[in-house]
Every structure is written in C-alpha cells, then in structure tokens.
Amino acid sequence: MLNCCHANTKLIWGPPGTGKTKTVACLLFSLLKLKTRTLTCAPTNTAILQVATRLHSLVMESLEYDTYGLGDIVLFGNGKRMKVYCYPGLGDIFLDYRVKNLMQCFSSLTRWKRTLESMSQFLQDPEKQYFSEIGLKSLEEFLNEKHSHVLSSFCTYKRISRNDDHIMTLEEYVQKLWINIADEYSDKMDNIKSFMTLEQFVKKTFCELSEKLKFLIQTLYTHLPKSFISLATMKKMFRAIELLRSIGISLGPAKFKQTLDASEKERIPSCFLPSNSEIDEFLKILSFLSSSILLPELNGRNQIEKFCLSNACLVLCTVSSSIKLYTEGMTRVKFLVIDEAAQLKECESIIPLQLPGLQHCILIGDEKQLPALVKRKIADSCGFGRSMF
C-alpha cells in the first residue's frame, strides 16, 4: 500500500475478540519502523487509549535504550477525561506531559546548553566556583578594598628588596608587619567559610547539577524524535549517566585530599583532580553533546506543542481532536487508521479524511457490534447516523 500513489481505502472487519485492536497495534508498529507519518483515530477516548496501550507495549519491548524512540509517538486529547496516568507508561507519549517536560529543557533557567556549561566549568575548577559562590576574597582583594596603604607599602618593600635572596610573600609580609590586619582577614574568611566548606559545596553542587543533567538527558531522549538524536549521540548520553553515577559514588568522606595550596585548609575531592580519567572522559562527552544536539528555538507552550505534533511519526487522538492537525505549517499525514470505525458517524469521519496529503485510509470495526448513535429522529432520517463502514 505504501508504494501505491493513488488514494486507497481498506476495511478490516471482525466481531468482538477477534484481535482487531491487536492488529491495529501491529500495523502501527510496522508503520513506525517504516517511518511513515500516520494518524490513528477512534470515536472515543477509551478506544484510542486501548490502541495506545497495545502500541506502547509493543514498542517498549523492542527498544534497546530505555525510552529512546518514544519521541516518534504522540497521543493527545483532554487529559482529565482520558485519565492517561491510569495507564502505565502512556504518560511518556502524552502530549501535555511531553510539552511540560520539554519546556524545562527550553526555558532560560534550565536550558540544555546552560546546564552542560555549568557542569563543565564546575568539574574543571570547583575551587573557583566555590570562592565565587560564597564571596571568598583573596588577601590582595581584601587589602585593596579596606587597607590599600598596606599594598602600597608591600610594593615599596619588593622594590627595595628585589636583590635580596628571600623576598616575603604578601601573606608573610602582612603576618609579620600588620598582624592586626592579618587577624581581621583571617576572622572574616573563617566566618564566611563557616556557612559552607569546600567539601560541602562540592557535594551539594555536584548533586544539584547531576540531578538536573540526568533529568534533561532523559527528557530529551524520551521526548525528542529520533531524527534529532542519533544512535551515536544516544550512546554518549547513556555513558554520561553512568559517569555521573560513578563520580557521585566517589564523593565519599574518604575520597578527599588536600589542595595544592599549602596555606589552604580546605580539601578537594580526589575524584576531581586533573589526573582522573573519568572526569576527562565526562568533559569530552559534555562537549560532544553540546555540539551534537541542536535544539530548535522554541518559546512558549504552543510552539513546543506544534513541534511535537509536526515531528512525530505516529499521532493518536480521537476523531474530533484530529482537527488540531489542520494547524498551519503542520507536517502532512500520509496514512490514516480509524479503529471502531463502525461507531463513527460518516459526517464526523470527514474531519481526518480531509487532511491534506492523505493517501491511504484503513477502517477497522464491526457495524453490528455498536452502531453510531444519533438521538434526534430528524437527524437520523437525514442519514447522520450512517457510518462509512
């Protein structure tokens, strides 16, 4: 059928219990593997949820990397009426849930690239991040702000003593000649450090960035179509999560060493030292992910929603909800599958059947099981109760 260019309609008939819904799920699974953009409809929420549940089960059994690939499937409709969260796993393909999660990837506060950069900067120089976070100043900065005359005196001392064998450092000079200022600086720095030590900062910051990065990685490979994330990139994402877990385990109390600066009493995790191979590998992966995953510039819920609907391979909804696919700029649907088509009024069938670009339609149902219901006799006499089946 896919190779036929002419418009085509097929009927699949069968009484209850003959496997119609299972057939639909298998058909959709095959269309997914063929990357054929398909719309699947049903008259009711219950019917479309049954198809979605069967399809989700088939797809999950075939996935090699967690939920990578579910981004090619989207289910949409009224969340409260559908009660999607009563169906295990369907939340991962439900449009409202998908948009909510992707908005966090695109937002300015948790943007994907911003988080990658923050993690990279933190791993390369945690001490610098620590000093910046707590407002810790060097002795020179402290003197420049409050005791500039001491700096001037030290500069004069260095100029006079430039030929001496031993020239005191700024710390030694202040400690010897300005003991009261040295004590003032020491007390101020101790008070600042008492709020959070370097060890505490490293653990806290790594934990926060790690959780945020894991969430973003899992969100992207679950909710973005495969066309945006290649298999090679997916493997790097999985490796990144493994390294996050491994580095996190290394952050134990016995894994800390003195920093290289002998005057510094704080300690830095040994797993963060430059020689650590896991850190080197992780930094390379962060750089790779930053350049390989290019997210579109999307602002607001409506743009992300349209992006998800346009790029999905399989779209599932009720017949009446398919009106949403008439949005300007929407990618065309090639294949239409309608389950429980015998329950569908012919006039209602027109909504998905008028979609531009549609080439093939498959109707599944049993007209003797539960025909379309029309309450008004006038409407019934005019043929509104007739189904295409």
Kindly label every feature range from the protein language model.
Residues 16, 44, 366:
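Short, conserved phosphate/pyrophosphate- and ester-handling motifs at nucleotide-, phospho-/glycolipid
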Residues 21-36, 50-58, 354-355:
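Walker A/P-loop NTP-binding motif
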Residues 2-9, 31-33:
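Phosphate-binding P-loop
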Residues 34, 320-389:
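Conserved helicase motor core of SF1/SF2 NTP-dependent helicases
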